[in-house]
Amino acid sequence: MNYYAIQVKTRGEEKFIRLFRALHPDCSIAIFFPKRSIPVRRKGVTVQTTPAVFPGYLFLETEGETLQSFHWQFRKTCGFYRFLKSNRNIQPLSGRDLETVLHFIKKTGPLAGISKVYFDENSRIVVAEGPLAGLEGNIIKVDKRKKRAKIKLDLYDDSFTIDLGYELIEKAVGLH
């Protein structure tokens, strides 16, 4: 399996997927658009929002040379900007980039939910389960009031931060 990243119009990712599927129903390439669920409080009411984990990026899962046959169909679809690294140098994801993308595609599923965490005796965050598991080293800041953890993600040469929600649980007595 090879995974590729494409850049599309930000906040137009779902529209691009619908349009591409309508124009090319015979395409067997899987298109992934990972999202995250975070609580947002507006005017005293907390609601769950689902923004993108990687705004403006979609990920393609291919087997063999199938991407080459659909290369121009992706480029001609409205909202498409470019393949990564570039349109002339299309390379599959590898190394740390692939690990980060697979964490959100395979481990957490299409929607990264709320992580269950607790704080140790040194006030450091410890993830019990959820999408933050495995990303503890990437946590930059923890906002206890908003119940969000800001993490740093790298994709190709670009580095950006996103917020993931967490739920505080009590540490069991037998755990370390």
Put a short name on every predicted segment.
Residues M1-R124, K141, K152-H176:
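Acidic-enriched and Gly/Ser
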Residues E14, E136, R148:
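Active-site-proximal flexible loops/turns
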Residues Y118, G130-A133:
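Residue-level "contact hotspot" at macromolecular interaction interfaces
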Residues G130, V142-K147:
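Short, conserved beta-turn/loop elements at beta-strand boundaries and strand-helix junctions
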Residues L135-V142:
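Short beta-strand-centered aromatic/proline hotspots
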